Amino acid sequence: MKRYVVGISGASGVILAVKLIKELVNAKHQVEVIISPSGRKTLYYELGCQSFDALFSEENLEYIHTHSIQAIESSLASGSCPVEATIIIPCSMTTVAAISIGLADNLLRRVADVALKERRPLILVPRETPLHTIHLENLLKLSKSGATIFPPMPMWYFKPQSVEDLENALVGKILAYLNIPSDLTKQWSNPE
């Protein structure tokens, strides 16, 4: 069993995090979850959910550990804590900006900082449009520092029939990037 950190910041698209966590759990991985206060508000607004745990079965919760964003004393804040990858999904531009300047003032930002300094996979799924120059410069800076910028772009070539198809394709692509098998992962094949 491998350990993954999933951070949820205050950007729209929290369903992507929920789907990713479910897929990681289905693959029997341990998932450490950190949710920002704005992320909790978005969770309620977009999914109508008061409690993060209510989104998962009792069996799934055995693999999920939720951490307070203020728990800077968490083992996750140390480079000695083994983590396969950190994924911040969705990732607000506030979080992008903070990470890009090394501001590690809460557990979510510290875990991202640790991923960069330890040269571990850090995947950021920024949810903002349009992007202005400062957004782009911050994302470029993070990319140059080793982060993978994974914007939630629709994959029209799979001919999605619903928004859920688009969500699943993105989550499947993240899982494929992490080399985690999933039924959500699709591979392009030329229809000719």
Curated annotation (Swiss-Prot):
Q: Which domain of life is it from?
A: Bacteria
Record-listed FMN binding positions:
G10, A11, S12, S36, S92, M93, T94, T95, R127
The answer to whether keyword Flavoprotein applies is: yes
| Coiled-coil positions | none
Q: Which Gene3D superfamilies match?
A: Flavin prenyltransferase-like
Q: Select a single GO molecular function from the record's annotations and give it.
A: flavin prenyltransferase activity
Q: What exactly does this protein do? A: Flavin prenyltransferase that catalyzes the synthesis of the prenylated FMN cofactor (prenyl-FMN) for 4-hydroxy-3-polyprenylbenzoic acid decarboxylase UbiD. The prenyltransferase is metal-independent and links a dimethylallyl moiety from dimethylallyl monophosphate (DMAP) to the flavin N5 and C6 atoms of FMN.
Q: Which family does it belong to?
A: Belongs to the UbiX/PAD1 family.
What is the name attached to this protein's record?
Flavin prenyltransferase UbiX
Gene encoding the protein? ubiX
